[in-house]
Amino acid sequence: MPLNKSNEVFITCAVTGSGDAHNKSPHVPRSPKEIAKSAIEAAKAGAAIVHCHVRDPESGEPSRRPDLYKEVTERIRDSETDVIINLTAGMGGDVFFGSSESPLPLKDETDVAGASDRMQHVKECLPEICTLDCGSMNFGDTDYVMANTPSTLRKMAEIASALDVRIEIEAFDTGHLWFAKRLFEDGIIKPPILIQLCMGIPWGAPDDLNTLMAMINNIPKDWVFSTFSIGKNQMPYVAAAILSGGNVRVGLEDNIYLKRGVLATNAQLVEQAVKIVESMGSKILGPKEVRE
């Protein structure tokens, strides 16, 4: 496939995530105040979109408490920083099996909720965007399964559409993209369609360029896509996204290092992405332009 370089690119910053990065870097925000502050700094560095999870302020463990999301969104809005808020709706589909020999009982970390409960914070905060993880997968080398059934995803998409909240499809593998196209064909999600290709996360789609292009070649031409990879491949994927006609995601959810041995802030990761985008001759879009 010939190169289809993006001449205009928007940057998403994934601010904190739900993994254990908070135990590895002091820069990973935990409290709503810290998450909002980091999101604002990322926006000022050049991110048009901030993708936010929340954490328990004391333990740093992932949470889906609506009051925490409410505080994050209110703090960002009260700062009068122009940025598009994108809230995760991925929480509530987490199944942790006991072990390979004794899968039951499930571990205490298991958190499985219905579609309405998983969307409660979206109802209360009304972000411009919320995510929809369009499938299930074995997540990493543990007994954790990210579980998202078709009926649950359809209901969540219907709730978001009724709230006039734009859905960002998260596709971790080809089957997720296939299901997203079915949601579109069934009229459950409306254009314009925004999709994030989540690459290199075990055990979804690997982040080699052949697999990336296979995913991209299966995206309808009028859909808007971003893509990212994790860890040391985060910044190389900024260039890959631009060269393949897509948009960019960076942030501490996916990578905690600025370079080998140097822990990053979200703003620093965005600044580094900005340098790559501009060095490749592309224009960085602001939130107003992205909305249009």
PLM features: what roles do these ranges have?
Residues P32, Y69-M146:
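Active-site beta->alpha loop and helix N-cap motifs at the rims of alpha/beta catalytic domains
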Residues I129-E253, L263-A264, Q268:
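Catalytic alpha/beta core domains of metabolic enzymes, predominantly
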Residues C13, P32-K37, A47-S59, I84-A89:
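Histidine-centered catalytic micro-motifs
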Residues K275-E292:
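Mid-to-C-terminal alpha-helical segments outside catalytic/metal-binding sites
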Residues C13, E61-A89, L153-A162, A214-D222, ...:
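Alpha-helix-loop-beta-strand connector modules within alpha/beta enzyme cores
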Residues I35, A42, H53, C130, ...:
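Conserved, mostly hydrophobic/aromatic
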Residues P2-H27, G92-G93, F97-S102, T131-F139:
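N-terminal small/glycine-rich loop or linker at the start of catalytic domains
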Residues N23, A48-V72, D141, C198-M199, ...:
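Glycine-rich, proline-tolerant flexible connector loops at the mouths of alpha/beta enzymes
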